[in-house]
């Protein structure tokens, strides 16, 4: 029978740790973000990421595997229908941990663990438009820098080209 990694358990036995992580994952998927201790957030992250990855696959086998961890069917339904499609094109990194200081009563280090919002199509389009604008500004700046140098060269060329153009016109008139 597999057991959790050696070392300190979160709150006691291995069974208690398993249930604690399942409840934390359930709350995370229900609310999108939860505040907990840093140790619990660090232990929750791989569990939650694994569940989202299974939900992205979307088949009945993976749904049953997720139901072994999270027993609330409504949360599992939300995970499979709303949360997993958001991360369709994201290979991992579905959660973010932000440290928020120490708890007032026992000075325990606290953190917020939240689901990272996937880029929407509108956000991607906005980002692409901003990048295109920046490129256009850079190109205009380069053209302006090159323009004074090019004008001085162009001013010299028409004077040299003018006699050749006149000679060509004369040849055309003679024919």
Curated annotation (Swiss-Prot):
UniProt similarity note: Belongs to the bacterial ribosomal protein bL17 family.
Sequence segments annotated as region (Disordered): 127-175
Keyword vocabulary terms for this entry: Ribonucleoprotein, Ribosomal protein
PANTHER family: LARGE RIBOSOMAL SUBUNIT PROTEIN BL17M (PTHR14413:SF16), RIBOSOMAL PROTEIN L17 (PTHR14413)
Lineage of source species: Bacteria, Bacillati, Actinomycetota, Actinomycetes, Kitasatosporales
Protein name: Large ribosomal subunit protein bL17
Pfam families reported for this sequence: Ribosomal_L17
Keyword Ribonucleoprotein assigned: yes
Record Gene3D superfamilies: Ribosomal protein L17
InterPro entries named among the record's database cross-references: Ribosomal_bL17, Ribosomal_bL17_CS, Ribosomal_bL17_sf
GO molecular function: structural constituent of ribosome
Domain of life according to the entry: Bacteria
Example GO biological process: translation
Gene assigned in the entry: rplQ
UniProt keyword Ribonucleoprotein, yes or no: yes
Listed Basic and acidic residues bias regions: 131-147
Single GO cellular component term: cytosolic large ribosomal subunit
Assembly: Part of the 50S ribosomal subunit. Contacts protein L32.
Position of the signal peptide: none
